[in-house]
Amino acid sequence: LLRHPDQLAAVRDDPDAIGPAIEELLRWLSIVQSAIPRITTTDVEIAGVAIPAGRLVFASLPAGNRDPGFVDSPDVLDIRRGAPGHQAIGHGEHHSLGAPLARMEMRIAFPALLRRFPGLALAEPFDDVQWRSFNFIYGLKSLAVTW
């Protein structure tokens, strides 16, 4: 949101914006990078790629959430979109049990943080932000901000 001031302002100023914003932020910046690894039980072809039986496969959750067949303009953050059906926190029997808590925390924390610090901004260029190297769970090493 700090890179999109117009959308940050909407979340800060419009109580109805937070619900769709949470879903869009989860879709756009998926925290968990892959689904539970699976082993193919039969030969299968996916998008023209042959995968033999017995191979370990990983499903990329961010790739699914950025699929243009799933959402229009997938690389554009649009907090009004809402992005229902994203895979950011699993799906079906593999949906995270903590999902309702995570959504509630974001529903409370984002508006409160943005009201308390209305001038919240990045303190360094976004390209200088350091990311964690562990690739299963996505995140920042740190985030310098000003207010």
Feature-to-residue mapping (PLM):
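Cytochrome P450
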Residues: 1-147
